[in-house]
């Protein structure tokens, strides 16, 4: 799922940059537990909020997505009309619609709010799927927009960021303290960054779990919008058109990994299909 990968990558980068800038400026988290928690919340939520605000721009730039302003082909006109019709059913402002060139069957939705969003599809998706299946994929992405998944993800990421920063500083303070009560600032900064990365990885498991639950919900939303058979057909098509991607890129695809994993942004295709059949 592109929006999750881009959000997490941007969030981590911003979090690291903020910490470095604050350290260079001499703004630290020394003080009582209350001030440390407040400092951690500012750092944690700033990163996730900036990631959210930049998500649409970063998504466009990263894949070279071309927004359809005026349809040039019948296919582009159909895409716009389909997204517009689905947005009306959700009572949403029509998202921007974009196409990007990639042989990989893929699609994603992103944006800072329910009424300022982007839905993009790859040329590979359009080439490999029928109109009914593409309609189901669009409905899945529209469900993410309608459910406000990006904003909810921002809040969750902000909370876990806060505890990542808070706990890493607590541990760094204990390790960097000398016998005479003084503290090595270099050791403090290094230890806090190491534990921030470690705790950040553990915190990502929480975000990934949340992402998998939202995928089930988006599948259900798509089924409600266009019917479960179309969504099941789209997922089965993804199973029949595997794409050889580096392991670190699996989270970028609409299907995610084919197996269940703690680090997967998506449930397995088989589990998603089974869940849809049980509706």
Swiss-Prot record:
The keyword Transmembrane helix applies. Its EC number is 3.4.24.-. The chain crosses the membrane at residues 4-24, 34-54, 155-175, 189-209. Keywords: Cell inner membrane, Cell membrane, Hydrolase, Membrane, Metal-binding, Metalloprotease, Protease, Transmembrane, Transmembrane helix, Zinc. Its main location: membrane. GO terms for biological process: proteolysis. This is Protease HtpX homolog. Its cofactor is Zn(2+). Zn(2+) binds at residues 140, 144, 215. It is a multi-pass membrane protein. InterPro entries: HtpX_protease, Pept_M48_protease_HtpX, Peptidase_M48. It is found in: Cell inner membrane. Pfam families: Peptidase_M48. GO terms for cellular component: plasma membrane. PROSITE patterns: ZINC_PROTEASE (PS00142). The active site is at residue 141. CDD domains: M48B_HtpX_like (cd07335). It comes from Neisseria meningitidis serogroup A / serotype 4A (strain DSM 15465 / Z2491). HAMAP family: Pept_M48_protease_HtpX. The keyword Transmembrane helix applies. The lineage of its organism: Bacteria, Pseudomonadati, Pseudomonadota, Betaproteobacteria, Neisseriales. One of its GO terms (molecular function) is zinc ion binding. Binds 1 zinc ion per subunit. Belongs to the peptidase M48B family.
